[in-house]
Amino acid sequence: GFAGELAEKLNETGEQLRRRNEIIARRDTARTDWIAGVSHDIRTPLALILGWGEQLQQDEALPAAARQKAAGICTQSEKIRSLIGDLNLTSKLQYGAQPLRRKAVTVGPFLRRCAAEFYESPAAGDSTLELELTQAAEHTVVQADEALLLRAIENLLHNTVGHNAVPVHVTIRADAADGMLTIQVTDDGQGYPPAVLAVLQAGETGENPPHILGLHVVEQILAAHGGTAAFAQALPHGAAAALTLPL
């Protein structure tokens, strides 16, 4: 009868959906595994290039021009290494293959560590950074994956210094209120290009979407923690990112 035919059709549809979901899951797993494999294969030769570049950079027997070129090789190699890390991480976060290793993270010491690592990075150049923490934020403890949260802040800082032709001043502000931790990263540079901001704020990609992998990873990390990442132009000029995390 009609009921029997309907049940048969529903079962058929359910089986088709199940098979389709299996295919999608296998495809996603294959993509994640492929990216992880390629990332792993690139790391070894890249480490050699970086090591040799550093040796040449420090070799006083070489002319200054050659040492300067070696420094450029090191800088670009670091950019490639960061890009590979972001590519691997965004894939894992997208398909739920990146476990969150949550632990108690005290905000004050964590942000001071971010600042110290920024100054130790060659990418910082002559840029400067200051921290402004409220008393509440200083001692606030958030349950988070510290390594991922550090990556999010690193990506914001590297984006800031990497997309400005001259050194910039970066400010990291933090406050805790109403069950939320807010971390703001602002700079006094040229700000986000309009095309980048259109993608970040409204998801408008256009025909030639800008490459915002590093900032997309920031969004994914915050989303994985149940938080948000918002981007805007700073006033009078510069870029501003606001990260929020539930406490």
Model-derived segments and spans:
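Membrane-proximal HAMP signal-relay module
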Residues: 1-36, 49-57, 212, 216, ...
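Short alpha-helical segment of the dimerization/phosphotransfer core of two-component systems
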Residues: 22, 75-80
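A residue-level detector for a conserved hydrophobic packing site
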Residues: 80, 149-153
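Conserved micro-motifs of the catalytic ATP-binding
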Residues: 95-100, 141-144
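A conserved beta-strand-to-alpha-helix junction within the catalytic ATP-binding
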Residues: 101-116
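Short helix-loop "hinge" at the ATP-lid/N-box region of the Bergerat-fold HATPase_c
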Residues: 159-161
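Acidic ATP/Mg2+-coordinating residue in the GHKL
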Residues: 187
